[in-house]
Amino acid sequence: PKDNIERAVKKGAGEMDGVSYEEILYEGYGPHNVALIVEVLTDNRNRTIASVRHAFSKGGGNLGSSNSVQYMFDRMGSITVRKAAIDEDQLTELILEAGADDIYTQDPNFYQVITSPANFDNVRSYLEEKELEMLSAEVIWNPQNRVEIEDSKKAEQVIKLIDMLDDDDDVKSVHSNF
């Protein structure tokens, strides 16, 4: 286990010599028509596709072709800021200076700053320079519509598949419309 952990850390830091990694996007449907986008970073495309396909199959889903679910999501930068850290007017002024696209204020505890993926690093760096504490900052696949699953057993099936995919060392992130 120690070797696996060290290898995973080196892989994440890009410190493994002579190994080239590629980013790949897999798409498919989970149980109950939940759309999934799986982002991977791998040094072995064949191993990873087999692992992802196995997880989809075992989890009651189907691995789809390229662009089979991507059209249901918007790619965007998302930065989360605690409301207690700054007032809305101050944050709005900062994000306009930084070049962000929008701010969502519906959550009672957090603001969500939205950027284009191309401008994400600039906005994040600008907010860091202004010493604004960010709880999260990442480029995400945001679903245009969410699938509501009322039945807890059905929801558990979806969560189980997402967890199986997430447990794969090559998987960077899993996005769903659930």
Question: Where are the regions a protein language model picked out?
Answer:
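Long, contiguous binding/interaction regions
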Residues: P1-P31, L41-M76, T80-I149, K153-F178
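Active-site-flanking beta-strand signature of metal-NTP-handling nucleotidyl enzymes
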Residues: A35-V38
